[in-house]
Amino acid sequence: MPVRACLKTSALLTVIATMLTLASYSLTADAATRASQFKLANGLDIIVVPDRRAPVVTHMIWYRAGAADEPPGYSGIAHFLEHLMFKSTEKIAVGEFSKIISRLGGNDNAFTGHDVTAYFQRIAKDRLETVMGMEADRMVNLRLDIKEVLTERDVILEERRSRVENNPSAILDEQINAALYLSHPYGQPVIGWEHEIAKLSRENAFDFYKRFYAPNNAILVVTGDVEPEDVRALAEKTYGKIPSNADVMARPRQQEPAHRAPRRVDLKDPRAGKPSWHRSYIAPSYMTAKPGESEALDLLMKVVATGSTSRIYRKVVAEDKLASSAGGWYSGAARDSGKIALYAVPADNVTFVQIEAAIDAVLADIRANGITQAELDRAKKAYLAEYVYDSDNQASLARRYGWSLTVGRTVEDIEQWPDRIAKVTLEDMKAAAAKHLDIRSSVTGTLTPAKPDGAAPPSAPNRT
């Protein structure tokens, strides 16, 4: 079985900017508007994006369920169920799902986020019906042997120990995120807290499965060498046989109160290789922002913190030599709130106080004076180039549509994004900076390679 992982934010690509000019930001219809959409009688939403250059397809099924939908005290159950979905059904023996895909010449995997869980296969087009039948089968016919459940729970506990408990940077990231959200479940880790993972049961997994896994709570995305009507016919033949589930529940969530004071998290750990400085701000997501606001934040963080031409990098790395690296990003692909993140790795003999003061000075200048037209133009070119690049990749297209639709956006929202980016003004950028680079809505964290004050050095817990 392939390694399953909680989804992490990946670095944005910066490529083929020369393909675009400042004179025109519009994309062709072929790059920006290619999706067909329809819905089956049982409520399954289907998106098809043809790409006929090679006889292969990417098939993804997305569920409107993630770590933020878990009941209190059961963190990690969404990710746990993702693992268990690769066990067995009435038709497929334990551990055979991925082996069958491999024998068919394809590959598969899955991931869990706070708002989504997704399963995908890349396969030859003439195997699509087989894959759709397999995925439809495990949507309703999952079988869980208690021994397999307990074994997989141990696998996840070990995954957490190796990826989090033995990684000081991951510990700090988790602690910052928990401090950032005063009430909202985005503050709990997707993989779950260790003490809660250890108590997850077969019954807990089935409860989550029965609550969220149904055609009327799912989105099917198929990209590649296919015709929309052919996909519709195959979907009717496979997924269409599954009845909708009237018991699929809404997704009530704790709402975040107003943030009135900044918070700090300072972690000392002798296992840390180098000191590092971090800050996260709560921000609106593309779902909750006012029109144009998230687009402005995307562009703002491109100017402020992305790459060697960014304001923060130029100031703290290139000019003042205070850091060996620095950067940041805006993450707005969420159902509820988004996040702005910054980081810096201090140079030798540079203190966190110096780093923080320098970065705060850059942010204060941006808030007060905004950015230049040249900076805005470069940011637009870079983002639109990335959009074109991603549009040339089946898997990227499937993720673009699947993720956005699963958190509540529309095909129109997705395909008109380049036009909205092109319309962002300098005034929009300045307003976004003034509103959302608010220290009261932030958590600042530091990681120091040293023994914690008044405590023994941390060590990974013994495996039980």
Give residue spans per PLM region.
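N-terminal secretory signal peptides that target proteins for export/translocation
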Residues: 1-8
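Charge-rich, well-structured scaffold segments of protease-associated domains
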Residues: 2, 34, 39, 96-249, ...
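Bacterial N-terminal signal peptides
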Residues: 10-25
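Boundary at the C-terminal end of the N-terminal hydrophobic targeting segment
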Residues: 26-33
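Short acidic-hydrophobic surface loop/beta-edge motif
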Residues: 36-41, 265-268
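Active/ligand-binding-proximal structured segments within catalytic/core domains
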Residues: 43, 53-101, 279, 291-304, ...
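Peptidyl-prolyl cis-trans isomerase
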Residues: 50-53, 463
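His/Glu-based metal-binding/catalytic segments typifying zinc-dependent metallopeptidases
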Residues: 161, 178, 247-309
